[in-house]
Design a protein with these regions (language model features):
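Extracytoplasmic ligand-binding site segments that recognize negatively charged/polar headgroups
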Residues: 33-39, 75-218
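Conserved C-terminal helix/tail region of periplasmic/extracytoplasmic solute-binding proteins
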Residues: 315-341
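Early extracytoplasmic/lumenal segment of secretory-pathway proteins
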Residues: 24-89
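Mature extracytoplasmic/periplasmic domains
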Residues: 258-316
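Short beta-strand->loop
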Residues: 97-106, 122, 151, 237-249, ...
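A bilobed periplasmic-binding-protein/Venus flytrap-type ligand-binding module shared by bacterial periplasmic
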Residues: 133-138, 178, 252-264, 282-283
Length: 341
């Protein structure tokens, strides 16, 4: 293990001791963050509590589909991570348990609001602003300036040079559409998306695929959460990031307890641990740079400071509603996805 991971293990163990979280048993978790983050949490929690952790990695859209599929007989106890909109949809559909953590006052306001908006059926665990990633070598080779705004992405020099995900499968891409609708108004947002379409080479299934393509030199620009760009830069790839000057949205990565899951008490113990400062160090240990929701977690300088960028007043309750999500995605599929380039 790296030194950071060892320190994280020690901090998490002390947290577990102070919270009296030692217990045998089992907890079944769907994890919608990066694989190493999931694995670190699973390993440390299992070692220090004796609890058997069954961890399955799924994207947020797939996770919501699984919870719906098994709602008559839930197999899952906890859903950790992924964009907050699907968690709000799960809450709306009665798939998750109302649970008000005593640690809520320690969390940032945006994490508390996520809990309140869901009637305490989910909670925010991290914040990640939306922006652009770009390959610095490709920009230099093509004598292009890095995009600084949503408007810049429409420039003809970026024709076929942009990748973004498909909002039907990606929370990242849905966050982009919802952000543009709130920033521009719905009609102008869809005019923008149609104008952007010729510049998009492909709509990927995964929200992280575009920035990985930019890192490998397969595309010049990605629409991504900026923390995913930072991860690629830390791993040595020639990428940079920016948040658009007109304003942008952010994901509130969330955590939910599944209603009528097989191990509800074990789920509550894990949930409480995952909200502690010790439990929130695993993202950074896995080279992930979202802002943790617990205010007592030291902020790494590589994390984007929300106070230093132009964030819109994103309406998570409205755009996290199932009907609104379905409507906007259906409109995008009809008007944008299959339009001529």
């Amino acid at each position: 293990m790296r030194k950071l991971t060892k320190n994280t293990l020690a901090a998490a163990a002390l947290t577990l001791l102070s919270h009296g979280a030692f217990a045998q048993g089992q907890v079944n978790i769907i994890c919608s963050v990066q694989a190493e983050w999931c694995n670190l949490m699973s390993t440390v929690y299992s070692r220090t509590t004796g609890t058997k952790v069954n961890m399955t990695a799924k994207g947020s859209g797939e996770a919501l589909a699984q919870l719906n599929a098994e709602k008559a007989n839930p197999k899952t106890d906890i859903w950790f991570g992924g964009t907050g909109d699907p968690h709000l949809q799960a809450a709306e559909q009665g798939l998750t348990l109302e649970y008000k953590s005593p640690q809520l006052p320690q969390l940032h306001g945006w994490a508390q609001k996520q809990a309140a908006d869901s009637k305490y059926r989910t909670v925010g665990v991290y914040l990640g602003p939306l922006g652009f990633g770009y390959n610095t070598e490709l920009l230099a080779k093509r004598k292009l300036k890095a995009p600084q705004s949503w408007a810049d992405l429409l420039k003809p020099e970026f024709k076929g040079e942009v990748q973004m995900a498909n909002p039907a499968s990606s929370g990242t891409a849905y966050t982009m559409i919802a952000t543009l609708v709130q920033l521009m108004g719905e009609e102008k947002a869809f005019e923008y998306l149609k104008a952007l379409h010729p510049n998009v080479s492909t709509y990927t299934r995964s929200g992280t695929a575009p920035v990985k393509a930019a890192a490998r030199g397969e595309t010049t620009v990605s629409v991504s959460f900026v923390h995913d760009v930072t991860t690629e830069a830390v791993n040595g790839f020639p990428v940079g990031s920016v948040t658009p000057s007109e304003g942008t949205g952010a994901e509130v990565g969330s955590m939910s307890i599944v209603k009528n899951g097989p191990n509800t008490e074990a789920a509550k113990k894990f949930y409480e641990w995952a909200l502690t400062p010790g439990g929130q160090q695993f993202g950074l240990a896995a080279k992930q740079f979202q802002l943790p929701s617990n205010t007592q977690v030291p902020k790494d300088p590589r994390m984007t400071d929300p106070s230093k960028i132009k964030l819109i007043n994103y309406d998570y309750a409205k755009y996290g509603a199932s009907a609104e999500r379905r409507r906007l995605i259906a409109r995008w599929e009809k008007e944008v996805q299959n339009a001529a380039r």
